[in-house]
């Protein structure tokens, strides 16, 4: 049993509140336990200069944490004048993950911006961001289809993400902050609804892990992501 009374293979309490804000084409407040992230999707006509004239769309992401999302206040990155390497890494991960959902050749020359703002952090902010932003992206697609009448549905399928870790030889699913800080190994996994891998980010924090332990963590991640995608479908009414 874990510090929050979960089993090792159990997700935290997960929720998705769609249409959370008024103006964005898609918006979701996603909660992974005490981690809460506001994910908004904004649609703009046009694409980056290097894509102009190719008939393709683009999807990109930005990520940030509110100053008091954690135990102590962190200065806004805008006030510091630059983004941290961590922020840049995470928003690239989110963008890559969400582009796997969409056939960009069917999106027209439109750009969808996914903004993921962490309101409260207790571990797994990047995996919560991917999983919540996927729903916001679906709602934004519906908005495009209503107003721009795309010739074909660009949706390929859902994606979701979860963290797993290894501590004292045991695999843990969906780490909170305390678990993430104390585990021997942590791994972030992003997958499609077909069970394909998009991203694997793994680090041995305290000691190296074996191939068998890697397999244990990936099996656990597959289980968790299948459950998350089922929850996404329920939230979308599918």
Swiss-Prot record:
Coiled coil: none
Enzyme type, top EC level: transferase
Gene3D superfamilies reported in the protein's UniProt record: GHMP Kinase, N-terminal domain
Catalysed reaction equations from the record: tRNA(n+1) + phosphate = tRNA(n) + a ribonucleoside 5'-diphosphate
Cited SUPFAM superfamilies: Ribonuclease PH domain 2-like, Ribosomal protein S5 domain 2-like
Protein EC: 2.7.7.56
Keywords of this entry: Nucleotidyltransferase, RNA-binding, rRNA processing, Transferase, tRNA processing, tRNA-binding
Binding annotation for phosphate: 86, 124-126
Source species, domain of life: Bacteria
CDD domains (UniProt xref): RNase_PH_bact (cd11362)
Listed GO biological process terms: rRNA catabolic process; rRNA processing; tRNA processing
Keyword check for RNA-binding: yes
Function text: Phosphorolytic 3'-5' exoribonuclease that plays an important role in tRNA 3'-end maturation. Removes nucleotide residues following the 3'-CCA terminus of tRNAs; can also add nucleotides to the ends of RNA molecules by using nucleoside diphosphates as substrates, but this may not be physiologically important. Probably plays a role in initiation of 16S rRNA degradation (leading to ribosome degradation) during starvation.
Complexes and interactors: Homohexameric ring arranged as a trimer of dimers.
Family: Belongs to the RNase PH family.
Name of the protein: Ribonuclease PH
Organism: Psychrobacter cryohalolentis (strain ATCC BAA-1226 / DSM 17306 / VKM B-2378 / K5)
Gene it is expressed from: rph
């Amino acid at each position: 049993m874990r510090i929050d009374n979960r089993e090792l293979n159990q997700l935290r309490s997960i929720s998705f509140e769609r249409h959370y804000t008024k103006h964005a084409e898609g918006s979701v407040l996603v909660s992974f336990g005490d981690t809460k992230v506001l994910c908004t999707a904004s649609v703009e006509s046009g694409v980056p200069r290097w894509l102009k004239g190719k008939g393709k769309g683009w999807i990109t992401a930005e990520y940030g944490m509110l100053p008091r999302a954690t135990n102590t206040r962190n200065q806004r990155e805008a006030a510091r004048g630059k983004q941290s390497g961590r922020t840049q890494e995470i928003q690239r991960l989110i963008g890559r993950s969400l582009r796997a959902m969409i056939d960009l050749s069917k999106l027209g020359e439109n750009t969808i911006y996914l903004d993921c703002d962490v309101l409260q952090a207790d571990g797994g902010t990047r995996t919560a961001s991917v999983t919540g932003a996927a729903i916001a992206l679906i709602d934004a697609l519906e908005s495009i289809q209503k107003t721009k009448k795309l010739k074909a549905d660009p949706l390929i399928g859902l994606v979701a993400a979860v963290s797993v870790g290894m501590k004292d030889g045991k695999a843990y699913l969906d780490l909170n902050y305390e678990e993430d800080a104390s585990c021997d190994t942590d791994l972030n996994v992003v997958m499609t609804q077909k069970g394909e891998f998009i991203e694997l980010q793994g680090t041995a924090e305290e000691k190296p892990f074996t191939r068998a332990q890697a397999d244990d963590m990936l099996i656990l991640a597959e289980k968790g992501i299948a459950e998350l995608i089922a929850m996404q479908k329920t939230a979308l009414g599918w």
